[in-house]
Amino acid sequence: MHEMILCKLGEVVLKGLNRRSFEDKLMANVNRRVAKCGNFRIYAKQSTIYVEPKDENCDIDAAFEGCKKVFGIIAVSKALPCEKDVQKIIAAAKEYLADEMRAAKSFKVESKRADKTFSLTSIQLSQQVGGALHQAFPTCEVNVHDPKLVVHIEIRDDSAYVHGPAEEGAGGLPIGMGGVAVSLLSGGIDSPVSSYMIAKRGVKLEMVHFFSPPYTSDAAKEKVLSLAKLLVPWCGRMTVQVVPFTEIQEEIRRNCPEEFFTLIMRRFMMRISQRVADQVKAKALVTGENLGQVASQTMEALRVTEDVVDLPVLRPLIGMDKEEIVRLSRKIGTFDTSILPYEDCCTVFTPRHPRTKPNLEEVREAEAALDIEGLIDRAMANREFVRIKF
């Protein structure tokens, strides 16, 4: 038998009558993720997704790394299947974990029996396998309290499986089970993290980016597309709709009070994002807004910003401080790209003294001089669609 991958399910197992649809979606997501790594058989049994190579050309290491980023999976391990026979299990453990046993100074064996018809109890199996391994690798001591290596034996309905420590999975729910949302993606640290957090709840994302040439460069746009590519392994395939925003910002600067520049700009972003959401049948908007980080993120300012839409505005970063956001940005691999020093449309025409506690009626009055619908129509008509795949 050949090495394979075991993906342990998380919240999916709690879904009751809907569980099968969640498992089907998760298997489809895993299949999509490992497709470029070779020809694999994907199937689900006993709260586990099995990823089994069909031939020797499969890149199981690449598939393993891909599985770790699939939402819905809490743990991933490479394992060697074998017959449900004690001597076969011992032989498999000696062969499969030989390098780990030689490198470790201590070990223990943990056994689990999903198949209760197996002749030995979990403790008895651990004792027999542990004794045989210690005899084969005498420099590796048995330590059941603080081992350097844990050898796992799983007795399941179809086979026994031998593996070392599992690695952490992405958690969450399978992409596609939580509906569709439109995420406002800028070039900063926050919006990629907020997109990741919403995708983790099973939401498929459509991205919108606002681009303001010549005030923002092509390099700034490419930076955002690079961020989207970094999100794809987590969030799945997506389309980034690049919306030209220059005319809107120039009209705001010409016709509106400076203290409201940022607020009115963000109200336009929300209006356009809702238009996009209506087109792609999304049920929510997602932003990287926090509470109190900048002048436009006070409670009063957030209220003014979302006044122009009727969809829910999801702000997953609202309770996090900057250090937590940066830490998560590093984890998902977007931080180094996010801090590249390129312009962003949010920094264009920044007011010197922004209003931190704006009055909604004053803001509505300030933007009344603008041809709101005409500006939005022209921006929507000139969008660029960039499709990003694995």
Provide a role label for each language-model segment.
Residues 1-182, 192-238, 307, 355-360, ...:
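RNA-binding accessory domains that recognize and position tRNA/RNA substrates
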